[in-house]
Each structure stands twice: as C-alpha cells, then as structure tokens.
UniProtKB/Swiss-Prot annotation:
Matching InterPro entries: Ac45_acc_su, VAS1/VOA1_TM
Subcellular location: Membrane
Full protein name: V-type proton ATPase subunit S1
Domain of life: Eukaryota
Gene, per the UniProt record: vha-19
Species this protein is from: Caenorhabditis elegans
Record key words, sorted: Glycoprotein, Membrane, Signal, Transmembrane, Transmembrane helix
Null allele phenotype: RNAi-mediated knockdown at the L1 larval stage causes arrest followed by death at the L3/L4 larval stages. RNAi-mediated knockdown at the L4 larval stage does not affect development into adults. However, only 26% of the progeny hatched into larvae which die at the L3 larval stage. RNAi-mediated knockdown at the L4 larval stage or in the germline causes egg compression in their uterus. Fewer oocytes are produced in the oviduct and are endomitotic. This results in a reduced rate of ovulation over time.
Length: 451
C-alpha cells in the first residue's frame, strides 16, 4: 500500500533541487552535498553559488552544451576546467543557517566555513562569483537554486498565516505568540474564534495535540535512571504566532511546527509508581519545534527537533536541569519516534517515543513524548473542501501498526501453548492398550518409544 501511494505522490508532486558541484583540490565523487556542508571548515569551505531560477537546463545552455561553440561563461568554464566535477540533486533544503551571505563583493570576509554567493539572475550571480571565487582557497563550489539552501535570507516557503501577513512578506520577523488558549492544541488554528487563520489551497498541514509526557533520563555510575510525568491538556494552555508553522506547497520539503505551552498546575514526575523524581511549577514554559521532512520518494518523517525552553527541578538523586538556548537534535534522536508516514496520509499516535534534548547537566537529558496527536503535512484528496473547512484527511495511519509489542507477546505465548497442547495430544495418541482377555500373558499397556 505504501509503495502505491509513494508512486502516486511522485506523480502528484515531484520536486528536487538540481546542483553542479566542482572543486580543484577535493575529490567529491559520490559525496552528497549535505555531507560536504556538514564537514566544511574555514580551511576547506563550501561555496554555494545561487540564483532563484537555477536548473541543470539553465547550466547546459550557459555551457553551450547544445552547440559546438566554446562557452565564454565564467562559471561554465570553471566547472569544465576543474579537476573534480559532477551534477547532483537532492530532495530537500540543505541547512546553511550560519553561512556568510554575499550579495556584493564588499560583504566578503575570510574565515567562514560556508559562503552563499547570491545573484538575482544568472548574469549577476556569475559576475559576483568571478570576483569572489579566487579569494576562497581549497573550496568546493555548489551551483544551485536559492531555494535549495536553508538560510534566513533565502526562505522559499510561505508561512501559514493570515491574509494580511501573506500579503506583506514571507520573510518578516517572527511575531510574538498570543497565548492562553485551552487544549486541545490545533495549529494552524483555522477558523477559530480566538485566532482565525484562513485555509489556503496548497497549504494543508495540520498539527493536533492533547497532552505531553516529560521523560527525564539521568546517568549515574554508568546506570541510566528514568522518571516521567504525564501532563494532560487540562494542565496546559498554548500560544500561537503567525510564524509558528512552515508549510510548503507540495509533499516535498521541510514542514515545521513550533509549540509554545504553559503549565497551569504544578507537576510531579515519578520514578516507578512511588518515588518522586522531579517537579515542574505552574507558569513554567515548554517551547519546542518539530521539523518533518517530505522526500522525493513519497515518504515523510520527523527529521529534526529543537527545544528552547524546558526545565525541571530534581529530587535526590535526580539533578535539576534545563535546556539552555536552542538545542537541536536529529538523526538517531528522532528516527525512532515512529512519527512517519506516506505523502498524502496523516498520522495518528496515542503516544510517541520521546525525543531527548541535552541539558546544562551533562548526565541529564529531558525528553518530550507526544500524547494523542495527529499530524498532517499535505492533503491532496479534496482541495476544494479543504478551503471551505480545514480538516484531516480520512487516509490516516497509526503509529502503533498492526502488531504491537503486546500483540506479539500474546501471539508467541499462544503459539507456545498450542505447540505444547499438540505435543501432549500426539503423545497420548501413541499410547496403546491391550485387551487382557485376548492374551493374558501379554503386557496390558504398551507405550511406543520413538527415537
């Protein structure tokens, strides 16, 4: 079923970012652009050369790929004459939020691991690259679209917001969150009395939440101790601002939900059923972001999470700890949460696995698990009905799946009992009784023993 929907989603919305990579000093064959960015240093930097309309077709035209005449374009010649070069594509944006943005030559300063050379079209991009590339030694150049690079000045996706916000600017500063709304949490808050956001065709992401479980992991003498506190929605209020949801138009890209919660009562976390481990006070705030990524193959999953406001007060032996600043986790920290599905489907989950964030105490991590949540990234079933009334699609997957751990325990236990019963039955069937009146000299009971 997933394969069929993956194929269908490719037909509905297939988008990827083209890129041309080149370098004179570093072998780049087969290395994804994202890996090159992760390993970039000031001594071996990565230079993005971007314009909004870049495609491989545009590069082919500039390189005179369809004629026999040599190209006079600086970038085309640089790629052709480089020692290592290749073309790539990737299905979602590459994170380069700390890159040095260069839209003019006088903005350049040496020492950055990542640069972004930006032009509004090919000619301005090429001219600026010609001025700057020679100043950046041992670099890997990546010619691609502006949309392919995640940077504050290259935001490509529209924020889901009010009509007034959309008409002003996609890149306006984050508004202050308005709060005090009762649970359940639904963002964007479409057609709500307290904060009305109008549904728009093409932007159909939704996030629903009824509660949280806060999990504390503490390491002491090479042993991990866990304590948790279930916090129902009745103990929370939530807040929302116009920039709290990032919702691309399509199934491919990064979908971001920012959650702002405030505790309405004191909470006590327990180790087991009787031992107090930590507390959270009334008025404490919990702020975290969830980034779901839709890929080219028709799947989506939680790819990244960050927390900026999360703290506990511990009882001995648990330590008090807090998340200072914005802590970002990804990779193995998010891949086991079971928050994944197929393009066009929503996901319902009674309880997710916790996402753990590092704290100011090296031995303590604080995790957040979603309770009774539903997540939708893109609903292409009924776009007209969506605009009339925002809703979750009926195509919904559950994070538990058909066979849970409890189901398998029951199935295996039943199979073992059935096997024992069958073995006993077969053994009883092999017992033969003799009629002593036919031949009183024979043994009355014969039990066959087979090797």
């Amino acid at each position: 079923m997933r394969v069929l929907f993956a194929v269908f989603s490719l037909i509905m919305a297939c988008q990827a970012y083209d890129a041309v990579l080149f370098s004179n000093s570093r072998e780049i064959g087969g290395t994804p652009a994202a890996k090159l960015v992760e390993s970039a240093t000031a001594e071996e930097p990565v230079v993005f050369i971007v314009n909004p309309d870049f495609t491989l077709g545009q590069f082919s035209v500039k390189a005179n790929a369809y004629t026999s005449e040599p190209s006079a374009d600086y970038l085309a010649k640089s790629v052709k004459n480089s020692n290592f070069h290749e073309s790539q594509y990737f299905s979602h944006q590459i994170e380069a939020t700390q890159a040095q943005w260069l839209s003019s030559a006088d903005q350049y300063s040496a020492g950055s691991p990542i640069y972004i050379i930006y032009g509004e079209e090919w000619t301005s991009m090429e001219q600026l690259a010609e001025q700057l590339i020679s100043k950046i030694d041992n670099s890997v150049g990546i010619i691609t679209s502006t949309d392919a690079v995640a940077h504050e000045k290259s935001s490509r996706v529209k924020r889901v917001a009010t009509d007034e916000f959309n008409s002003d600017s996609e890149n306006s500063a984050a508004a202050e969150a308005n709060g005090g709304f009762p649970f359940p949490l639904v963002i964007p808050p479409y057609n709500q009395t307290f904060y009305s956001v109008k549904p728009t065709n093409g932007h159909s992401c939704l996030f629903y939440l009824e509660g949280l479980t806060v999990v504390v992991e503490q390491k002491k003498e090479k042993v991990l101790y866990y304590a948790n506190a279930y916090i129902p929605g009745s103990n929370f209020t939530w807040a929302y601002s116009e920039t709290d949801v990032t919702c691309p138009n399509g199934t491919i890209g990064d979908f971001i939900f920012k959650i702002h919660l405030t505790l309405e009562n004191d909470i006590t976390g327990m180790q087991g059923t009787s031992k107090k481990a930590f507390t959270m006070k009334k008025g404490d705030k919990i702020d975290f972001d969830l980034t779901f990524t839709g890929d080219l193959f028709g799947y989506w999953a939680l790819n990244k999470a960050s927390a900026s406001n999360l703290a506990i007060s511990g009882y001995d032996p648990y330590k008090s700890a807090s998340v200072d600043g914005s802590k970002v986790v990804n990779g193995s920290a998010t891949q086991y949460t079971k928050l994944n599905s197929v393009a066009g489907w929503s996901l319902a989950c009674g309880q997710s696995q916790a996402v753990f964030f590092p704290t100011n105490e090296q031995s303590v991590r604080i995790g957040v698990a979603l309770m009774n949540t539903q997540i939708q990234l893109f609903n292409y079933q009924n776009p007209e009905k969506w605009v009339e009334s925002a809703h979750f699609t009926l195509q919904t997957e559950d994070c538990t799946g058909t066979f849970s751990s409890g189901s398998w325990m029951g199935i295996v236990s039943a199979l073992v009992l059935i096997a024992g019963l069958m073995f006993g039955y077969v053994m009883l069937q092999s017992v033969q009784t003799m009629d002593r009146f036919d031949d009183p000299k024979q043994r009355q009971i014969v039990i066959n023993v087979r090797e």
